[in-house]
Amino acid sequence: MVDQLQGTWKSVSCDNFENYMKELGVGRASRKLGCLAKPTVTISTDGDLITIKTKSIFKNKEISFKLGEEFEETTPSGRKSKSTVILDNDSLVQVQDWDGKEATICRRLVDGKMVVESAVNNVTCTRTYQRV
């Protein structure tokens, strides 16, 4: 499944992103900038190491990890979290834990597009990406 997600993807649609960021505690100005961003995501592998690079006008971010192994990351909003990524059916599922809270980011292929669903509490954001 990771092989199918490898490559470069450009954001083509976004639903409920501002509310998702608000639920994360992101300030108003950063939420507005984040909503304007049309990120490009590149997913690659080197053996069992997976790297996800996200580039936008707002911020750039890179994480590298092995499936099932916890790692530390700093999110674009500045949160420091412990994350674990697993392969669940046809989805790459990332769980971020910080300060007793949890967010889930699920990446999967739907009709040739990468769909990323991010959820915290009862707020879900869906971003759709097209292969570049």
Curated annotation (Swiss-Prot):
SUPFAM superfamilies per the UniProt record, alphabetical: Lipocalins
GO MF term list: lipid binding
Binding site for a fatty acid: R107, R127, T128, Y129
Pfam families: Lipocalin (PF00061)
Gene3D superfamilies the UniProt entry points to: 2.40.128.20
Record-linked CDD domains: FABP12
Tissue specificity note: Highly expressed in adult retina and testis.
Alphabetical UniProt keywords: Lipid-binding, Transport
InterPro entries with a match to the protein in the record: Calycin, Fatty_acid-bd, ILBP, Lipocln_cytosolic_FA-bd_dom
PANTHER family named among the record's database cross-references: FATTY ACID BINDING PROTEIN
Family named by the database record: Belongs to the calycin superfamily. Fatty-acid binding protein (FABP) family.
Function: May play a role in lipid transport.
Listed name of the protein: Fatty acid-binding protein 12
Organism: Mus musculus (Mouse)
